[in-house]
């Protein structure tokens, strides 16, 4: 089993908490992207980043002096979004870190795909960014099937905890010999299941922590996730989707 998750926009430098253990698999492609970003004017870069002037200025200056070899942070500690707060990797036990290092991958517009302890530097480049590099219209074309093929080399079962923006770069290439299962964390609204961004991010991070704590390796174990008031709903799930509903475990228990 391999687990895929999204990165976060906010990143920090933390070179002391954990040692870096490995280089990103596609560092050559990352160097290409860095060269491309350095060739852009401020206005061109700001358009790609789709952000305000304060963030654009910070990232433009960051790109100008960026070095992919020094002052690196383990990827899992570099990202600072809600998902990572609930995963709380900085307090994982040694055996739990070993679990995520073996099973978890972070998808990235800049690095492609990362193991938790791969060394990274802070950047801003979302997977949906419109780049024009090597005749590719966007990063989905730039990365192509590379990221999926990396996963396929290691597993025939991918658990998708990533957002649509990022899982899209894997889903479009899935072959019959690999099973990809997506976790949905939502609430029932009439006949529909609605995913709320904040709750979904919280649950994805909590799921990674849950899996690391219990060394989960099977689908049946994943279904037992019951944190943050979520519980598995068998009726809404199928072979490619595991649905976890918020606030319904007590309702089912009373039936």
UniProtKB/Swiss-Prot annotation:
Cited InterPro entries: YaaA (IPR005583)
Name of this protein: UPF0246 protein Cphy_1568
Pfam families cross-referenced by the UniProt entry: H2O2_YaaD
Record family assignment: Belongs to the UPF0246 family.
A GO CC annotation given for this chain: cytosol
GO annotation terms (biological process): response to hydroperoxide
NCBIfam families membership: PRK02101.1-4
């Amino acid at each position: 089993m391999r687990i895929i998750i999204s990165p976060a926009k906010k990143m920090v430098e933390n070179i002391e908490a954990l040692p870096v253990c490995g280089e990103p698999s596609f560092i050559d492609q990352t160097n290409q992207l860095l060269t491309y970003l350095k060739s852009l004017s401020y206005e061109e870069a700001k358009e790609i980043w789709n952000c305000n002037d304060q963030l654009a200025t910070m990232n433009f200056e960051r790109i100008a002096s960026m070095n992919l070899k020094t002052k690196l942070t383990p990827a899992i500690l570099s990202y600072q979004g809600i998902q990572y707060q609930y995963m709380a990797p900085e307090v994982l036990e040694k055996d739990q870190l070993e679990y995520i290092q073996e099973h978890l991958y972070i998808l990235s517009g800049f690095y492609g795909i990362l193991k938790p302890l791969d060394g990274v530097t802070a950047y801003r480049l979302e997977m949906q960014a419109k780049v024009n590099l090597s005749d590719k219209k966007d990063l989905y074309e730039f990365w192509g099937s590379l990221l999926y093929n990396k996963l396929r080399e290691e597993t025939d079962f991918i658990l998708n905890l990533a957002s649509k923006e990022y899982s899209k770069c894997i889903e479009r290439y899935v072959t019959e010999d690999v099973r990809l299962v997506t976790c949905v964390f939502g609430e029932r609204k009439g006949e529909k299941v609605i995913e709320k961004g904040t709750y979904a991010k919280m649950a994805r991070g909590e799921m990674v922590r849950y899996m690391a704590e219990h060394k989960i390796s099977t689908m049946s174990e994943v279904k037992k996730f019951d944190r943050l008031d979520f519980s598995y709903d068998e009726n809404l799930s199928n072979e490619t989707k595991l649905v976890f509903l918020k606030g319904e475990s007590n309702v089912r228990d009373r039936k």
